[in-house]
């Protein structure tokens, strides 16, 4: 029960981040598209944050692949636990 909860709660993180950004910008009563775009552009274009973002994405995707595939028939094969680097954003 709890493993299923954690498995699907990770998928709600973008919605929770947007909700938190909306609640912090409640004076304008609009979705904070500009602050989010500014944050993402700063996040992508800075070398340190770019490296940190790639590491975080790799760790999260490895964790998710472990959760989703740990009960599969390929339990002895450890290669499926590690995601490929093809999805990482490189400038």
Curated annotation (Swiss-Prot):
For membrane topology, the record states: Multi-pass membrane protein
Q: Tell me which UniProt keywords the record has, alphabetically.
A: Cell membrane, Membrane, Transmembrane, Transmembrane helix
Predominant subcellular localization, coarse grouping: membrane
Gene Ontology cellular-component terms for this entry are: plasma membrane
- Localisation: Cell membrane
Membrane recorded as keyword: yes
Q: Which domain of life is it from?
A: Archaea
Q: Which residues cross the membrane?
A: 5-27, 47-69
The protein's name is: Uncharacterized protein AF_2352
Q: Identify the taxonomic lineage of the organism of origin.
A: Archaea, Methanobacteriati, Methanobacteriota, Archaeoglobi, Archaeoglobales
């Amino acid at each position: 029960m709890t493993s299923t909860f954690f498995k699907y709660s990770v998928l709600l993180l973008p919605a929770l981040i947007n909700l938190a950004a909306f609640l912090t910008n409640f004076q304008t009563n609009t979705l904070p598209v500009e602050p989010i775009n500014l944050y993402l552009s700063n996040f992508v274009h800075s070398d340190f944050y770019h490296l940190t973002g790639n590491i975080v994405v790799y760790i999260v995707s490895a964790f998710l692949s472990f959760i989703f595939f740990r009960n599969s028939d390929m339990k002895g094969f450890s290669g499926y636990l590690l995601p490929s680097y093809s999805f990482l954003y490189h400038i």
